[in-house]
Curated annotation (Swiss-Prot):
One of its GO terms (cellular component) is extracellular region. Gene3D superfamilies: 2.60.40.2970, Collagenase (Catalytic Domain). It comes from Aspergillus flavus (strain ATCC 200026 / FGSC A1120 / IAM 13836 / NRRL 3357 / JCM 12722 / SRRC 167). PROSITE patterns: ZINC_PROTEASE. Zn(2+) binds at H235, H239, D250. The keyword Zinc applies. It is an enzyme of class 3 (hydrolase). GO terms for molecular function: metal ion binding; metalloendopeptidase activity. This is Neutral protease 2 homolog AFLA_119780. Its cofactor is Zn(2+). It holds the Pfam family Peptidase_M35.
Length: 284
């Protein structure tokens, strides 16, 4: 995950999408093999996902976890942390860069939920509300050691913040006629690449499910730390700042990576909330 700060040390808003990936059944196009000593280079234009029109110096850094995939399943994670890179941005040129999500402003119609997808999402929203409320209660006054397992502290302020965010998720999931987000049963913008379960556009407070959300996930997991429709929906709601500010990031996917985070990062990690809600539900 990359973070950009202005000269005033304010974090520049990310205007791209945040995807949740499945943890098993991962197809080959999503995996890169590196031999000993090999490196991989990639390029991305930060002006396409952040408003840098004001120009001037900005600092860029990245940290998180790289998943290790064996036979299509995530089996572990390697942590990474970059150095801080300071660059001077030409605001005029940055303003002319085509935005990655510019087509969103031209949207005129979104297909409504229908049939099996509508039924599945309705159930997922109900389950997400239930799980979020249970987890909120546990965060506020439940087992300290269980909370610390996922959020790396028993500090009361952190417990209160986690509980407040989860209650906000429960409220949003429980409202299908109002609320702060738009939830799409399908992919209106074309960002459901292979292995993507769902995604959120935080700058628009929009969430969309992908086909494998319905075909690969059960409504509720019967196994600790497994993915399901309810916790995927919960995960996505935490990304949306319209539900609770600030929206969460994707700093560690899955139990192994999420439980290696610092307390500060765990508080801002979407999967930490999904995993904790699953653990409370199944008494993990």
């Amino acid at each position: 995950m990359a973070f950009i700060n202005s000269a005033a040390e304010d974090e520049v808003q990310f205007e791209g999408i945040k995807r949740r990936l499945r943890s098993s059944g991962i197809t080959k196009e999503a995996v890169t093999s590196l031999g000993a000593g090999e490196t991989l280079e990639d390029e991305f234009d930060i002006a396409s996902t952040s408003d840098l029109a004001s120009g001037g110096p900005v600092s860029i850094r990245s940290h998180g976890f790289v998943p290790i995939v064996v036979d299509g399943k995530i089996t572990g994670y390697i942590p990474y942390k970059s150095n801080d890179l300071t660059v001077n941005v030409d605001g005029g040129k940055a303003a002319k860069v085509t935005k990655a999500l510019s087509q969103l402003t031209r949207r005129t119609e979104v297909t409504d939920c229908k049939g099996d997808a509508e039924s599945s999402l309705t159930t997922a929203l109900s389950n997400a509300a239930k799980l979020a409320n249970q987890a909120a209660e546990a965060a506020e006054s439940g087992d300290e050691s269980k909370f610390e397992e996922y959020f790396k502290t028993t500090d009361q302020q952190t417990r209160t913040t986690v509980a407040e965010r989860l209650r906000a998720v429960a409220k949003e999931a429980g409202s299908t006629s109002g609320g702060s987000t738009t939830y799409h049963c399908s992919d209106p913008y074309g960002y459901c690449e292979p292995n993507v379960l769902a995604y959120t556009l935080p700058s628009k407070n929009e969430i969309a499910n992908c086909d494998i959300y319905y075909s690969e996930l059960p409504p509720l997991a019967q196994k600790c730390h497994a993915q399901d429709q309810a916790t995927t929906t919960l995960h996505e709601f935490t990304h949306a700042p319209g539900v609770y500010q600030p929206g969460t990031e994707d700093l560690g996917y899955g139990y192994d990576a999420a439980t290696q985070l610092s307390a500060q990062d765990a508080l801002n990690n979407a999967d930490s909330y999904a995993l904790y809600a699953n653990a409370i539900e199944l008494k993990c």
